[in-house]
Amino acid sequence: MLVFRQLFDPTSSTYTYLLGDGERGEAVLIDPVFEHARRDSALLRELDLELLFTLETHVHADHVTAAWLLKQRTGSRIALAAASGAQGADRYLEPGEAVSFGRRRLQVRATPGHTSGCLTYVLDDESMAFTGDALLIRGCGRTDFQQGSAERLYRSVHEQILSLPAHCLLYPGHD
């Protein structure tokens, strides 16, 4: 059984997503926010889930990630795009790879444009995709900093996100 929670940080208008395999007790957190590490840790305990990975959709300019703090608290691993150029991750992700938790997997798709290291994570049955700042509600992420490119973002959104099946629900990084 898939466990899913959408969590929100009102200060940065940022979404964090928890996905877990309820039968195996393993989970991932996508884009955790530093100020909510305690909330996220408590939720994992409440749901009896072991956090395997914190997954970053990109290197964030608008909030501090909770990945390091959650790693210290839970022993989880940090994963982000190899193309991000960031240091200190336990796993650097390439397009086409998958991140497993229990019997479930998230496929890694490169969606550069907002930054050069943006990723979208697609659930194995293509029912859900986590787009970070590549595709937002009524818009997309800025392209005027962090090696952004409007042309690359347009191609990424059309080729990697809008090409998903019609039943796929899209979950953005911001409100």
Model-assigned labels for residue ranges:
Residues 6-7, 18, 98-124, 128, ...:
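Core dinuclear metal-dependent hydrolase active-site scaffold
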Residues 19, 31, 58, 70, ...:
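Divalent metal-coordination and catalytic microenvironments
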